[in-house]
């Protein structure tokens, strides 16, 4: 099968031929129909994460946002059959531990990160293997398009879990979103669908325009002055919930500083080599104003049905964010384009 492999950090991925994965007794082999290209792939390609002992190994097949058709299942799989169309999370749970059984498979202690570790080769490939397939794979409704499902990837699922499950965003809340890339625009669209009012923050005019297109009621150009003051003015006192969707020190601090009393900061963006996993925050202010700081990773596999139902109903449309469909051969260049934020909306691999 054809696959895109990380050979050297920062060097073009090698698109090459590999053996098709074997099927484990509890696993499923999926023919990949589409796979989103994500900034987390860029972080992996750059070799980020060594400061947290989380560096993706060379030799890794990248890609972690697949949708496709089941072509084979192991003898221990009960709920999937060849021909089923499924979406696969990047945070794979074992399905049997206490966290998985209680709905927290996104932080399974025995879990695997699809496309980020050797035991879970990714989906920039013609085929991908899904372990614990009954637990991890979710059927896709017939009316939902392939590219739209791939766009859910880790951007919509990450934004949805953060907003709905961690911060419990509700009607009337003010939500600030710092960084209007894939995760940020997903958060704008989802928070709007939840009845919240959204302020979008970015340095790029086109990104802010895109945020308005998917529901933002106000925007802040981060190049034009103090972001926290601008958000406070737009919201009449500060955001109820604020998300750092980028992971830079500046966006993290701005997110915390723009909250009203008893607000909630959501950290979903991963840091770069500049921050190396650490950002200084005003802890005394967090205490003084009773502020919550929450991390959020992906989404439990068992809660995909909630998000797919939103998509099927038409309340959320991931297809709005898809800017380009590309081939597997183009993936090396599209990752390189992320270095200077030159991608075109959400980009999805649809030709293998």
Q: Residue ranges of each PLM-predicted region?
A:
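N-terminal glycine-rich cofactor-binding segment
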Residues: 5-22, 39-72, 87-88, 108-119
